[in-house]
Each structure stands twice: as structure tokens, then as C-alpha cells.
Amino acid sequence: MIAWTRFRERPWSGPALALIAGLAAALAHPPFGVLPGLLGYAGLLHLLDNADVQRPLRSVFWRGWLAGVGYFGLGTWWVGEAFLVDAATHGWMAPFAVTGMAAGLALFWGLAALLYRALRPASAWRVLTFAGAFAALEWMRGHVLTGFPWNLPGETWKAGSAPSQLAALVGAYGLTWITLAIAGAPAVWRQGRGGRAATGLAVASLIGLYGYGAIALSRPLSPSGPTTVRIVQADIKQDLKWDAERFAQIVQAYVSLTATPYAAKPADIVIWPEGALPAAVNDYLAPGTWVRQAIVDSLAPGQLLLIGGYRYEGAGPHPTYYNSLVALRRTETDLELVGIYDKHRLVPFGEYLPADRFLTVIGFKSLARLSDNFTTGPTPAPLRISPELLVQPLICYESLFPGLAKPDPNVRALINVSNDAWFGVTSGPPQHLNLASYRAIESAKPILRATPTGISAVVDARGRIVPGASLGLGESGVIDAQIPGMGQVTPYDNFGDVAFLALILISGVVSARVRIGKISSSIAPKRKLS
């Protein structure tokens, strides 16, 4: 006890505890799954309430920012792995990328802490103000520039678990508000009757979260349709991919797996991941090329092939590039183009360079070895790949964004192709799978997910991986499955983030009532004794 008191007296104890609180909250996310880490949010709320009284704004901001550094540092450290693919050239950038990303994303938490402080809540119900401030800034994190909603607090719950099912009602942002309100409540439980009431409501809400989820998981989905799919994962490591001498070997790996004998009839759809082959789709699918013929030979007549890859339009030294999903059908002797989906949400500094002209002038583009930018595709829309089958493609990190694709009741499944090979055997790929699976819950539609090195999977409309329908990191093989059934149209599909906005409004009303109550108390005339 004495040691703890001495520690608390240190000027650096608050910042250190804030960093630890952020780390704890990050540990609650998959693949770690240490759910008691959610108490990190209660710790952060306590630290914000007990900021330095002499410099409160500065103290609050830095505590929020440091908690964010811990949260995003542990949550996105895997981004450094991408710079180690070509370590001799880019390895020196890895520590700067990891720390820079964590520090930049943590600014949203610093601003959220300032917003919480500005509202100056005093009652125990300030936990709702805390939830509203941080949930609002998390929404901003998902929308500023192109947005990066990686590991929203509401997506702490493993997709497919009971608590995750509430995303079908309120979406990932609404679930973020609810998660923060529940997790922050222990910070106020000692504050008299109001604190006990707030904590009791949080406990009841947690029970309700699990109860609603259990009911949702027990509801039957529509029967699986007759459409079958084969997902191909060739386990081509990123550092080998751009070796020109290995190109034929990579093609052979994909076509061999595609042609693997079926237990019954050939699948209706074959899916290759994003960037499956290290060349432009225009080039390797050009008429007469050996690659085109190899693909034709690997398919049965009538089969559909969905290939993730880059393509270009126009001639000359600077054509227009797109990151695309190309749908092809095998005819009797050749391939015919069925449709193309172009990625809409591009990765900053990975697929395009913000302020391109300026950064090119100062030499950053050359330093980072970025070639011509990809071009943004149109607003995401479903792709009809057969007369009876409409799918919604999501390329790579498009699967992070709640509500990115407009709901369409005729869509049968979501197709997520991604190249997670950049991130090796780290926490990045399993986290990406978890986040993508939330789109299944929100839309009540299954996801067919293909990656080069894992994790490929068939995910049902409740966010659960279909038993036996996944390939882990470093595995090579195919997934053969029927497309799972759908659920009923969800409130989130119908109304989007309306529920989230209502929750933010509740936070605002609580804060306003507390402040009005304070003002009224301060100006009310004091009763004189007669």
C-alpha cells in the first residue's frame, strides 16, 4: 500500500497508468481476447477525472493521448511487418511507421479526452459523457481523410460471440458507445447512490448484451442455397511474390489448387485473393497468353472465377490504375468478362499518396518508392456475377468500414479479397478477419474471404466461421463450401447509424442536464432563516 501511494505521488505516474490503461484495452481485442482488459477504460476515466488541477487541459489531453498510444501501439504494431518484406530497403522505416501510426491515431483519443473535460460532468452519469466523447471521436477516426476504423472498441467482442450480435441493431459504432459505457462504469461505482445506480445499470446492460446475443444466435438462418464456392489460398509469401523468376511457379500454384479434384461437382464460383498474381490483370489475361490458357485449363465450363488484382486503363507512361476484383466465366474454350469492381476506399500511403504533388516535390514519393497512385473506384455497388447471383465485393480494408456498401436485399453474399501476406504471422490477419466478420453481422449476410497466406474463411451471417471452412496462416489449400444462408434484414441495414446518433444524443442530454443543474444550484437564492 505504501509503495502504491509513493508511486501515485510521482509526477509521471498518471501518464504511465494512462499508457497501461490503453494497453489493457487493446489486449481485450482478438486474437488476445483478454476481456478483463476492458477495465482499462474505467482506469482511463478515473485518470481523466483526477487530472492535474493546475493544468487540467494539458494533463487530460496527454493522458488521453498516451492511452491511445498504448491502445494503437499494441493494436497496429503489425504494420511494421510490411516494411520488413524488403528489409534491406525499407526495414529502417518500420519503427517510425509503427510509432508514427500509433501517435497519429492517438490524437483522436487526446481530443476525446479534451471533449470529455470540456463538458465538465460531475455526477456518476458522466460515464455516459465519457462513452459519447470517445465514441464520437472513434467515428471521426473512421471518416477523416479516408478513415481507419481499425479495432473500434465495440469490436472488442469476438465476431460471432453473443455480445457481437448487437451490431445487427446498432452497428459497430453504436456497440462502441455501449462497450465504453459498460466498461467505464467501475470508475464511478463508489460515488454514492448515483454511482451504484450507474454501475448497476452497466451490469444489467452487460447481462442484456449476452442475453440478446444468445437469442440472436439461436434464430435460424435461411437454408444454404445450391451455390457452391471454392476459395483458393496458395500461401505465397510477400517477399517471394515480386521475384520475376517465381512468376510461373506462382501461377502454377494457383491453377493447380483451382483444378484440385472435387468431392462432387465443380464449384460454381472460384475465388482468388487480392493481388493473387504479381502482374497487371490486363497483361496476364491478354488473349493468347500462356497464363490465360492455364487458367482456362484449370476451370470447368461454366465456372466463375473472381480474381483480385490491379488493372490499368489508358496508354502512355501514366495510365490509370485500379485495385479491382475481376469476374470471369469459363466458356467452352476461353474466358469471358462478367464484371469488374474497383476498390473505392484506398489505403493512404499504400495505394495513394495524400498531397501527392507536394510530397513528390519534396522527395517523399521517391523515398517511399511509391509509383503512380491507384484511382478511387465508384461508390461500392453490388456486382452481378450471374443472372441469379448478386454479390457485394469488399477489397482489403474496405471490410473495416461499417455501412460502406449500401444495403441491397438482393445481395446474396459479401466477397472480401485481401492481401494480408504483407503482415506475416502477426496479430494483423486474425484481427482483420474479426473486423471483416462484423460486416456479416451488420448485414445478416455471409462473407466469402480469400487471402494469399491466411486467414481465408467462409463466415456465416452471424459472424461465425463455418466449421471446416477456414485456412489458417501459412496454410496452402482450398475451401469448398456452400454459400451459407442469410438472416432477416437487420435494423442496421435499414437505418444505418441512426441508433449510434441517438446514443450520442443521450450523452449530450446527460451532460447538458448536469450542467444546467449546476448553474441552477449556483444562482438559486438561498433561503434565509426567520
Curated annotation (Swiss-Prot):
Q: GO MF terms on file?
A: N-acyltransferase activity
Give the chief site where it resides: membrane
Which segments cross the bilayer? Answer: 19-39, 65-85, 96-116, 128-148, 169-189, 197-217
Q: What Enzyme Commission number(s) does the record list for this chain?
A: 2.3.1.269
Q: Does the keyword Disulfide bond apply?
A: no
CN hydrolase domain sequence ranges: 232-485
- What keywords were assigned to this record? Acyltransferase, Cell inner membrane, Cell membrane, Membrane, Transferase, Transmembrane, Transmembrane helix
What's an example Gene Ontology biological process for this entry? lipoprotein biosynthetic process
**CDD domains, per the entry:** ALP_N-acyl_transferase
Cellular localization per UniProt = Cell inner membrane
Q: In which pathway does this enzyme or protein participate?
A: Protein modification; lipoprotein biosynthesis (N-acyl transfer)
Quote the catalytic residue positions: 274 (proton acceptor), 343, 396 (nucleophile)
Which superkingdom heads the taxonomic lineage of this protein's source? Answer: Bacteria
Q: Which GO terms describe its cellular component?
A: plasma membrane
- Topological category with respect to the lipid bilayer: Multi-pass membrane protein
InterPro entries per the UniProt record, alphabetical: Apolipo_AcylTrfase, C-N_Hydrolase, C-N_Hydrolase_sf, LNT_N
Q: Which PANTHER family match?
A: APOLIPOPROTEIN N-ACYLTRANSFERASE
What is this protein's function per UniProt?
Answer: Catalyzes the phospholipid dependent N-acylation of the N-terminal cysteine of apolipoprotein, the last step in lipoprotein maturation.
Give the family per the record: Belongs to the CN hydrolase family. Apolipoprotein N-acyltransferase subfamily.
Protein name (Swiss-Prot/TrEMBL): Apolipoprotein N-acyltransferase
What's the source species for this entry? Caulobacter vibrioides (strain ATCC 19089 / CIP 103742 / CB 15)
